Amino acid sequence: MALNIYHEARGEPVVGQVAVAQSVLNRIADNRYPNTVCGVVKQAKYNPWDSVTPIRNQCQYSWFCDGKSDTPKDDKAMLEATIVAQFVLSGSSRDVTEGATHYHADYVYPYWADSLIPTIKIGSHIYYR
């Protein structure tokens, strides 16, 4: 969870980082998605002959299969993401996304956005359910 927060919401206000984490929990609660944090974050398309390496740019979270290193380079931001992850996973936060399972940066408009209901904009992300 912390690594996903780091890559998806680094530089966002804390509430934006909480929102990214909450959207993962919302997916876990939805039977259309895997039922674990790792399952949701690592959900991707794989070649039939390689079940280990996801197909590039075919992941739910782009950082997971963009071909770049996933190792955090900003220790302070990773610490903050870890604290946010612990807070959300402990059940201490409320769902600020209003049930969102999807989000995107406000400077793009993905093909799936028209098929979902927008719920809220937090930081530079727009959330949908």
Question: What are these model-derived regions, one by one?
Answer:
Residues M1-R129:
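Bacterial extracytoplasmic/cell-wall-associated proteins, especially those involved in peptidoglycan
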